[in-house]
């Protein structure tokens, strides 16, 4: 497969420049016959989750295609689902560059992107043009300049706009790169947010005559007590699913490596054990009452199987996809 050569060339570039270059090429072919260049045939292995049928259990995690620019090209690679975003009500530039760093020896990434995106209205226009036949998730967040106390308003604004176009909606309250965002995972703040989101979902279901499930994305850095409380809140408010996990602030497995001290969330192989343990504990607490989408450090069939054995119904990749490329999709789906 050609990807090792592509990766070698891309890794000569700054990580964000490599991402921009790749997406520039994918944008050129998305929706054209040249999609055949990235298309690969993967087995159909249907999975039911959140009332939806996924053509296979492997999805693309949020963060790679923030604005939904390359849905069809990414879909051609064989993903059973694609989660675009995180998108916010208004466009925002994100944090200052540089803000994305490779930990090559650990096959990890550290990012402090800060929800850089072109806004929800732009994303919707891109979704309207797409012809992807898998499940499309849309991951939503709050603008950086929206006070945390008013954060739920941003989620509701996004829900209003994306509801007709989403297969499911992911609520991102766990990015470490938006000040104060993770506080929405706790206690009354979480309950208040989930009540508002569930009420909005009920209203939108009546308006659009369709039910779009809601999944909440959580951090891997929760304590045992916090995890129990989160699980309880998700069940009490009839949330449809949980995505575990986002990136970690823990650097214990990458000490001494180049870029290890950069501020931001760590993803990739160093996150695998931590996220799997959160999934295992979450599965015990939830006891089958809502499904788990497992993400964090999956870069092989074995890693994907570990997530499913721990309790995940579906799995997602991001950093592993950067390091291993499209062949990883086929490898996982064929052998999971």
Swiss-Prot record:
Assigned EC number: 1.3.5.2
Cofactor: FMN
UniProt key word Membrane: yes
Pfam families, alphabetized: DHO_dh (PF01180)
BP GO annotations: 'de novo' pyrimidine nucleobase biosynthetic process; 'de novo' UMP biosynthetic process
Cofactor note as given: Binds 1 FMN per subunit.
Membrane-crossing residue ranges in chain numbering: none
Main location: membrane
UniProt: substrate binding residues: 66, 111-115, 172, 177, 246-247
GO cellular component, one term: cytoplasm
Subcellular location: Cell membrane
Gene3D superfamilies: Aldolase class I
Keyword Membrane in record: yes
Catalysed reactions listed for this entry: (S)-dihydroorotate + a quinone = orotate + a quinol
CDD domains xref list: DHOD_2_like
Biochemical pathway: Pyrimidine metabolism; UMP biosynthesis via de novo pathway; orotate from (S)-dihydroorotate (quinone route): step 1/1
Active site annotation, chain numbering: 175 (nucleophile)
Enzymatic class: oxidoreductase
PROSITE patterns per record: DHODEHASE_1, DHODEHASE_2
Record keywords, A-Z: Cell membrane, Flavoprotein, FMN, Membrane, Oxidoreductase, Pyrimidine biosynthesis
Binding, FMN: 62-66, 86, 139, 172, 217, 245, 268, 297, 318-319
Task of the protein: Catalyzes the conversion of dihydroorotate to orotate with quinone as electron acceptor.
Oligomer and partners: Monomer.
HAMAP family per the UniProt record, alphabetical: DHO_dh_type2
Family: Belongs to the dihydroorotate dehydrogenase family. Type 2 subfamily.
Name of the protein: Dihydroorotate dehydrogenase (quinone)
Native species: Escherichia fergusonii (strain ATCC 35469 / DSM 13698 / CCUG 18766 / IAM 14443 / JCM 21226 / LMG 7866 / NBRC 102419 / NCTC 12128 / CDC 0568-73)
Lineage: Bacteria, Pseudomonadati, Pseudomonadota, Gammaproteobacteria, Enterobacterales
């Amino acid at each position: 497969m050609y990807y090792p050569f592509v990766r070698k060339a891309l890794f000569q570039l700054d990580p964000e420049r490599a991402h921009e270059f790749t997406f520039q090429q994918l944008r050129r072919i998305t929706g054209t016959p040249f999609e055949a260049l990235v298309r690969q045939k993967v087995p159909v292995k249907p999975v039911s989750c959140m009332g939806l049928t996924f053509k296979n259990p492997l999805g693309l995690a949020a963060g790679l295609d923030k604005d939904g620019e390359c849905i069809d090209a990414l879909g051609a690679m064989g993903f059973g689902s694609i989660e675009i975003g995180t998108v916010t009500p208004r466009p925002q530039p994100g944090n200052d560059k540089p803000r994305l760093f490779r930990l090559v020896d650990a096959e990890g990434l550290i990012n402090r992107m800060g929800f850089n995106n072109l806004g929800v209205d732009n994303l919707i226009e891109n979704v309207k043009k797409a012809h992807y036949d898998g499940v499309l998730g849309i991951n939503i967040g709050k603008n950086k300049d929206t006070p945390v106390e008013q954060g739920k308003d941003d989620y509701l604004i996004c829900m209003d706009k994306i509801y007709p176009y989403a297969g499911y909606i992911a609520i991102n309250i766990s990015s470490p790169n938006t000040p104060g965002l993770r506080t929405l995972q706790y206690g009354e703040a979480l309950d208040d947010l989930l009540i508002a989101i569930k009420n909005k979902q009920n209203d939108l279901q009546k308006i659009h005559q369709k039910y779009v499930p809601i999944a909440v994305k959580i951090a891997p850095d929760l304590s045992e007590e916090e995890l129990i409380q989160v699980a309880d809140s998700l069940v009490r408010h009839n949330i449809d699913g949980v995505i575990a996990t986002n990136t970690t602030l823990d650097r214990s497995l990458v000490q001494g490596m180049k870029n290890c001290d950069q501020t931001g969330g760590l993803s990739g192989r160093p996150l695998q054990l931590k996220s799997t343990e959160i999934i295992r504990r979450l599965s015990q607490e939830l006891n089958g009452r809502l499904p788990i989408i497992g993400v964090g450090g999956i870069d092989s069939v074995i890693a994907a199987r570990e997530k499913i054995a721990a309790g995940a119904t579906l799995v997602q990749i991001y950093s592993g996809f950067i390091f291993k490329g499209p062949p990883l999709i086929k490898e996982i789906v064929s052998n999971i």
